[in-house]
């Protein structure tokens, strides 16, 4: 994992209508909600994040955003990051990794890391 090109992430995210915010509850369960992230500087902001999402982020700051593709051959945009849920109006996420991901047309060689079609941003 290196530095995330937030400008590239914002550019790609503009082609999607919404994202899924994935958080972990204090009881170690996955919670998913539909969100409309915005990009401010080097931070991804999720305005109007639910109380549950903010509570989860306070307990487990590691979160993911997934923008699904319009069709099954398209790329999903996946952003992992560290969330700050202190603001009641929005969840702020510092991205730590971002990729475009889709199933590979042909599987890659075993042991080659991601055997899918992945593009680091």
Regions found by a protein language model. Give the residues of each.
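Short, structured beta-strand-loop surface elements
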Residues: 29, 41, 49-113
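Short, basic/aromatic recognition patches
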Residues: 1-18
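Short capping/connector residues at structural and topological boundaries
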Residues: 35, 103-105, 120
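Charged phosphate-binding loop/patch that engages nucleotide di/tri-phosphates or the phosphate backbone
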Residues: 113-121
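Short beta-strand segments
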Residues: 16-49
């Amino acid at each position: 994992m290196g530095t995330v090109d937030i400008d590239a992430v914002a550019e790609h995210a503009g082609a999607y209508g919404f994202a899924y915010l994935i958080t972990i509850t204090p009881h170690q369960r996955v919670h998913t909600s539909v969100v409309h992230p915005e990009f401010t500087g080097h931070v991804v902001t999720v305005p109007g994040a639910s109380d549950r999402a903010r509570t989860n982020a306070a307990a487990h700051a590691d979160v993911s955003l997934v923008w699904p593709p319009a069709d099954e051959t398209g790329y999903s945009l996946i952003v992992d990051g560290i969330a700050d849920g202190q603001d009641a109006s929005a969840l702020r996420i510092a991205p730590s990794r971002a990729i475009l991901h889709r199933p590979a047309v042909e599987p890659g060689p075993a042991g080659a890391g991601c055997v899918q079609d992945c593009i680091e941003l």
